[in-house]
């Protein structure tokens, strides 16, 4: 058959439309599933995987309050954030549960079945308070740091930790991630050092002195190629490291890195869809001036050596009449979302206002963003937004508003953390005169 006849043949297009290459490419564009293998797929195809994920996303986006059931659990500590232990976001298993990790007032690490609202595992009571909690859902691992400067790795099944490692300095930030070479943990400490360890064994791989002051921000890029680090001292310049040089350090030579030429960095986020793009939020010491600066990070061969280069591609200042942003997020590489008082604002990276949402009456007091969803909270309500696929208008869709049906009006409280996966929304409500409660919403399927 000639090429012309092949193009006209419906069977030819059907083969293309069902090809694993096409559907895997579409999946990689939308989700961080580079480590998702044919073994994870089992008997399913990449087309089935893609359509299954999109169906789950839309179920949450299209849900209304009556589509949710909620469970309330009391006596949750408020020192650390929540973290999902389950990999519900990327799975072909219809029966997989949403599992969330939290810390009890007795300093136990706890795992909760969100759909059932029940605790399914807890660690022994710890002598020292937890100060940090991260998870690696792909490996079903939780990693904690306590106030004695000890890192522990848990599988949330066995009673005791899989690995324990005392650190020389307090650690302000941790990042767990999975690469083609395996799972790793990156830690930034109060002395300005970045440590890299294997997981779950916590074997030391490298130690890099990045700053003369403590590190408060440590973020891996979506493709795990870059690591952003920022110190506590606002006059120091943030740095971006090549992850490969931290995982495979060369004796006698410093890891590849570059400074981003903007001080006063208050926050930063990588762009899920343009994986080498990062946006910084810079704020003056008075908090009256906020600027967003976007960089593209690349490597270049110069004289036989590889160097990292950061290109500033866009920037803008937030108008003086807007309340100073606290949180920010990004999606397709060309838009920035942030809060200002009761408003959620979506700007282009060049400073053009694209959308303004007014779904809360009072100031937004918490914010969470990932490649699919944006969550905001105010007083005792949660609002759900969803990114439109492909950056189409409307770029961010307002979806669902959950009021405080679980709230005890006799006590003062506020939502201190919120997050979601494709099947659930969880939040911590901190009470002034009591310990926090955990509220777990799940779709009533």
Predicted region positions:
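Loop/turn segments within WD40 beta-propeller blades
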Residues: 84-97, 133-140, 174-183, 211-213, ...
């Amino acid at each position: 058959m000639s090429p012309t006849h092949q193009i006209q043949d419906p069977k030819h297009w059907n083969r293309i439309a069902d090809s694993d290459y096409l559907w895997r490419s579409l999946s990689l564009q939308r989700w961080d599933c580079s480590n998702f293998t044919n073994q994870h797929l089992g008997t399913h195809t990449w087309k089935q995987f893609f359509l299954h994920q999109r169906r789950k996303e839309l179920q949450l986006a299209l849900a209304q309050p009556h589509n949710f059931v909620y469970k309330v659990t009391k006596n949750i500590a408020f020192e650390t954030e929540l973290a999902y232990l389950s990999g519900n976001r990327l799975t072909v298993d219809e029966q997989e549960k949403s599992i969330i990790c939290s810390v009890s007032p007795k300093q136990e690490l706890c795992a909760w079945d969100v759909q059932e609202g029940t605790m399914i595992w807890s660690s022994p009571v710890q002598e020292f308070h937890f100060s940090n909690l991260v998870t690696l859902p792909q490996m079903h691992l939780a990693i904690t740091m306590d106030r004695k400067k000890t890192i522990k790795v848990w599988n949330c099944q066995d009673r005791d930790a899989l690995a324990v490692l005392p650190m020389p300095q307090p650690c302000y930030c941790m990042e767990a991630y999975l690469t083609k070479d395996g799972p790793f943990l990156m830690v930034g400490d109060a002395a300005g050092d970045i440590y890299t360890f294997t997981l779950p064994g916590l074997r030391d791989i490298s130690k890099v002195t990045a700053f003369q002051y403590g590190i408060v921000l440590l973020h891996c890029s979506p493709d795990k190629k870059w690591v952003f680090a920022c110190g506590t001292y606002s006059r120091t310049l943030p740095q971006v490291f090549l992850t490969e040089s931290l995982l495979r350090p060369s004796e006698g030579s410093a890891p590849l890195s570059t400074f981003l030429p903007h001080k006063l960095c208050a926050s930063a986020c990588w762009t899920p869809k343009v994986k080498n793009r990062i946006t910084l939020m810079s704020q003056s010491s008075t908090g009256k001036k906020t600027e967003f600066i976007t960089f593209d990070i690349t490597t270049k061969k110069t004289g036989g050596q590889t160097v990292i280069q950061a290109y500033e591609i866009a920037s803008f200042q937030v108008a003086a009449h807007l309340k100073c942003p606290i949180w920010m997020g990004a999606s397709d590489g060309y838009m920035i979302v942030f809060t200002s008082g009761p408003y959620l604002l979506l700007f282009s990276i060049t400073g053009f206002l694209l959308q303004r949402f007014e779904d809360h009456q009072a100031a937004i007091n918490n914010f969470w963003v990932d490649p699919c969803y944006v969550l905001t909270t105010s007083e005792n309500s949660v609002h759900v937004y969803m990114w439109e696929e492909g950056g189409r208008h409307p770029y961010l869709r307002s979806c669902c508003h959950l009021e405080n049906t679980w709230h005890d009006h006799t006590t003062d409280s506020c939502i201190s953390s919120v997050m979601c996966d494709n099947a659930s929304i969880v939040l911590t409500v901190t009470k002034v005169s009591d310990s926090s409660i955990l509220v777990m919403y799940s779709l009533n399927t």
